[in-house]
UniProtKB/Swiss-Prot annotation:
Full protein name: Dynein light chain 2, cytoplasmic
Principal localisation: cytoplasm
Oligomer status and interactors: Homodimer. The cytoplasmic dynein 1 complex consists of two catalytic heavy chains (HCs) and a number of non-catalytic subunits which present intermediate chains (ICs), light intermediate chains (LICs) and light chains (LCs); the composition seems to vary in respect to the IC, LIC and LC composition. The heavy chain homodimer serves as a scaffold for the probable homodimeric assembly of the respective non-catalytic subunits. Dynein ICs and LICs bind directly to the HC dimer and the LCs assemble on the IC dimer. Interacts with DYNC1I1. Interacts with BMF.
Keywords: Cytoplasm, Cytoskeleton, Dynein, Microtubule, Motor protein, Transport
Record-level GO cellular component terms: 9+0 non-motile cilium; centrosome; ciliary tip; cilium; cytoplasmic dynein complex; cytoskeleton; cytosol; glutamatergic synapse
Family the entry assigns: Belongs to the dynein light chain family.
GO biological processes: microtubule-based process
Transport in keyword set: yes
A Pfam family that the UniProt record links to this protein: Dynein_light
Listed InterPro entries: DLC_sf, Dynein_light_1/2_CS, Dynein_light_chain_typ-1/2
Highest taxon of source: Eukaryota
Length: 89
């Protein structure tokens, strides 16, 4: 298992979906090294599991201001990397 600690900073999402997001991000980071590829993996998995349209941003330094559907937003850290995942559209 990964040694990356998950720290949820902000979430408007069910506990189960939050855990799915962390698990999915962990899998992505084990498979890929490039942030764009990690984001693509998470987005595609959530599109499959929870229906489109999900958006995912992965990185160490970014700001954001987004509109999301109710109960479909999470912002968390996995180790040193921030992950923003939300559904809109």
């Amino acid at each position: 298992m990964s040694d990356r600690k998950a720290v949820i900073k902000n979430a408007d999402m069910s506990e189960d979906m939050q855990q799915d997001a962390v698990d999915c991000a962990t899998q992505a980071m084990e498979k890929y090294n490039i942030e764009k590829d990690i984001a693509a993996y998470i987005k595609k998995e959530f599109d499959k599991k929870y229906n489109p349209t999900w958006h995912c941003i992965v990185g160490r330094n970014f700001g954001s201001y987004v509109t999301h559907e109710t109960k479909h937003f999470i912002y968390f850290y996995l180790g040193q990397v921030a992950i923003l995942l939300f559904k809109s559209g």
